[in-house]
C-alpha cells in the first residue's frame, strides 16, 4: 500500500542524515555502559542508557537496589517537588545553576509523568511535595527496579574497587568479583550519609582515580548541636509555625530565614526548618552561628505586648510562672522564665512595662548558640563531592576523562528538604544515562 501524499526522491542531504542516523543507531546498539550504584541516580541512569540502545550493566554492592530511597521521606519517599524550573534552582543553594541542563531535560513535571506512566499512583501534598499514593517508599523502588529490568539492564551484586582508564578514557570498572569493561562508566555511588544504606563514599575514591577534585565533604540537611542546657531540658518539644533565623555572629548577617516546624533534642535541634537551615552553614566554628527562634511569628511586637498585658491582667494575683498556660508549651515555660531573669513567684500585677517589653523581645528572638553539626552518618545528604567545574553540565561527562559520567549525590550539589535532592538524582541520572549511550 502506498502512503498518502506525493512520493518524491530523498535529497542528498536527507540521505546523508539518514545514513548518519543508521550509523548512530548501530553504534548505540553495541555500546556498553556500566553504572556503579543502584540508588535513585543509578537506576534512572541505567534505564535512560538502556532506552537509548545501550547494553547496560548496573553494579550494586547491596543485595537490594534503592536502599536509601527506602528511608527517604520517613519511609514514604518524597519523590520530587512539583515546582517550576526556576523555583527548583532557588532551592539548590550549592551549585544550583550547574543543573539547568539536567532539570530542563527532566523537569519535576516530567518526573511525575514518568512515574505515573509506569503505573505508580502519586499525590501532591503541602509545599508541592509529591509522594506515592500508598505512602510506601518500597513502591517507588519496586517500580524503578521492574522498569530497569524491563529495559534489559543487567543488575549484578558486586563492589567497585577501581576505575579502569586507558589513554585518557574510562574503559571499565574492576570489582571485587569481576572486571566489567565498557565504552562509558557512570558513577552514581551517592555520598557518605546513612552509610548503612551503602553510601560509604566509594564514588569519591573512583573519581579521585580519574584525577577529579573532591570538594571537602560535610553533612547537609542534618540536625544541629548546641551546648545550651535549655535544649536538653526541652528535648522532645516540637514547635510548629515558628520563625527560624540563622545569624552569622562574625558578620552579623542572617544566612537563613524561614518559617515552619522544629524539634528540641538532647543534643540540640532538629526538624524540617533546622535541617534546611544546616545547608546555609559553612564554617561550623563553635559559637559562630546562632539560631534565633520567633516563638510567636504571627504577632508583631506591639500585638504580643498587648497579649502579654491581657494575660497578666487576667492572672493578676498569680505567680508569673503560672500565667503562661495559654501562651507557651509547658516545656518552654521554665527556660523562658530563666532567661527573662525575674523571680518565678513574682505576681503578674507587679510586672513592669519594661519587664513586659523584655519578655516580648525574648519570645520574638529566643536564641540558641550552635556548636556543631551532628555526624555525617545522621545527615540526609552529603554536601561537597566531585567539583562541578570538572563536569560538563550539558552531558554530565567528566571534563578530564572521556567516557566517564557522574550523577546524583556524588556531585557537589545539594538542596533543601522537600523532594529537591531526589529530583537532582532523577535529572542528573537521566542526562548522564542518555549522554553515555551516545
Per-segment meaning from a language model:
Residues 32-58, 432-437:
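N-terminal Rossmann-like FAD-binding beta1-loop-alpha1 element of flavoenzymes
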Residues 156-169:
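A conserved short coil-to-beta-strand element within the FAD-binding core of flavoproteins
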Residues 156-159, 334-414:
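A glycine-rich dinucleotide-binding beta-alpha-beta segment and adjacent secondary-structure elements
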Residues 63-65, 70-71, 85-86, 121, ...:
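An anion/pyrophosphate-binding glycine-rich loop and adjacent beta-alpha core
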Residues 50-74:
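Glycine-rich FAD pyrophosphate-binding loop
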Residues 76-124:
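Glycine-rich active-site loop/strand segments that organize a redox cofactor
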Residues 29-31, 175-184, 257-258:
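Core beta-strand elements of the Rossmann-like FAD/NAD(P) dinucleotide-binding domain
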Residues 34-36, 160, 180-195, 208, ...:
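Short hydrophobic core segments
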